[in-house]
Amino acid sequence: LGEASVALGINTTSAGERSLAIGASATSTGGFSIALGRYANSVGEFSIAQGDHAETGADDAIAFGRESKALGIMSIALGATANASKEYAMALGASSAASAANAIAVGRNSAAAGVDSLAFGRLSAANAANAIAMGAESKAAENATAVGTNAEANGLNSIALGSGSIADVDNTIALGNQSQAVAAGAIAIGQGNKADGANAIALGNGSITGGVNAIALGQGSYAGLENGTAIGAQASAQGKNSVALGAGSVATDADTVSVGNTTAQRQIVNMAAGDISTTS
């Protein structure tokens, strides 16, 4: 027994100064440490291990719950089989895991694997440094942020906000339920829209871009090929470098500008007179 320590139970050991061990085969070896439960093991000074097979492995660590483990300095593990394995890590919830320094995992089976990462929600996963995943089954990569049920920010520096939103490649942004930004640098904002070309922008519910640098602005707008631009509800720029301006406008051929469609034409008015030159 350590000085002024207490051990209660079969094969119980309280070796640290002023330590406390209660339960069969419980062990408290750190000074001022506490081990409560069968096979509980409190190693660090001022640490607390409570629950069958609960374990602390460093100073000021706290483990509460069956088979919980707080192995890093000042780490905290709360919940059955929760595991905070690095310094200052925190795992809250059954089978949660915070496996990097300063990582925080909150929720059943949540996992924060990167330094300074945060996973909040059932089965959420912050897989790399500075990742933030908030929402059931959300996922985030390095420096990425995913917020919402099943949201995924899989690319470096990507952002996915909304249930089922996906920012799949580096530097992408998907904002809105079921929105998808799946090419490098793409931006998708709105419900159920998709930006599928590099540096493409899809803004508006149900808008879609399918080409590099394409832009679709407006509900249900579509810019399908490289450098296409569609502005307005249901506007459709189908050709390469084409432009569709106004609700329902359709530009089917490459390098064309459309302000209407085959059944609804528009006039372009209030234009200044042009200049006449030898190249006009």
Identify the residue ranges that each predicted region occupies.
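Small/polar residue-rich beta-strand/coil "junction" motifs that cap repeat-based extracellular fibers
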Residues: L1-I10, E17-N41, E45-N109, V115-S280
